[in-house]
Amino acid sequence: MTALSETEHKGAFYGRRVGKTLRQGQQQALARTLPRYLIDLPTVAEPAALFPCPVDEIRLEIGFGGGEHLLSEAKRFPRAGYIGIEPFLNGMAKAVLELDLAPQENVRLFNLDAALLLARLPEGSVSQVELLYPDPWPKRRHWKRRFVRPDNLDLLARALKPGGVFRFASDVPDYVDWTLREVRAHPAFRWTQTRADDWRTPYEGWPGTRYEAKAIAAGRVPTYLSFARV
């Protein structure tokens, strides 16, 4: 599969890029700290070289929100290089503010469409991809905007190494069912869970997220899916 160009994939990201006005501290952190962590497409041919510290593997989180899960995992696994992908500026600002206060050398950030990065990374260079509480696009006419769809699964399969892991968490039953159908139908992936407790139980070391806490408080039940690259 050839890499996508920015022109070819123009408009593939759906949703707002900016929400509420950023606080002064967030604006200052973006200006001061984001350039240190931000990567661009021409630099990803050698992913391990993106990090100033030695890393044994590369992991991605697509749509990291405020970054609490991304940064928690990076602390747990200091020998893994984490690339967080978030086009939404407000989420990026929250993560960068935390990095401004407590730098983490095994973290790098990407602020464009995840598909562009997945297409440029070397084949089989990623050990884990996480998609946690993505926008479910609940209206039927918007389902084509969901990230989990055949073209993006092709890109995930390309980037993941054999045995690599794709994780998906959501509190929207329809999107969970959709993801199970789409991923199980793709020849490059295998669903690794066999019991209900497997997908009802958070992943090992799961720190939770602010969004998840709100969902549970509202009575919604999260599901945690895991797939392996065959």
Curated annotation (Swiss-Prot):
PROSITE patterns: SAM_MT_TRMB. S-adenosyl-L-methionine binds at E61, E86, D113, D135. It is an enzyme of class 2 (transferase). The active site is at D135. SUPFAM superfamilies: S-adenosyl-L-methionine-dependent methyltransferases (SSF53335). It catalyses: guanosine(46) in tRNA + S-adenosyl-L-methionine = N(7)-methylguanosine(46) in tRNA + S-adenosyl-L-homocysteine. Its EC number is 2.1.1.33. GO terms for cellular component: tRNA methyltransferase complex. The keyword Isomerase does not apply. Keywords: Methyltransferase, S-adenosyl-L-methionine, Transferase, tRNA processing. InterPro entries: SAM-dependent_MTases_sf, tRNA_(Gua-N-7)_MeTrfase_Trmb, tRNA_methyltr_TrmB_bact. Pathway: tRNA modification; N(7)-methylguanine-tRNA biosynthesis. Catalyzes the formation of N(7)-methylguanine at position 46 (m7G46) in tRNA. This is tRNA (guanine-N(7)-)-methyltransferase. It comes from Azorhizobium caulinodans (strain ATCC 43989 / DSM 5975 / JCM 20966 / LMG 6465 / NBRC 14845 / NCIMB 13405 / ORS 571).
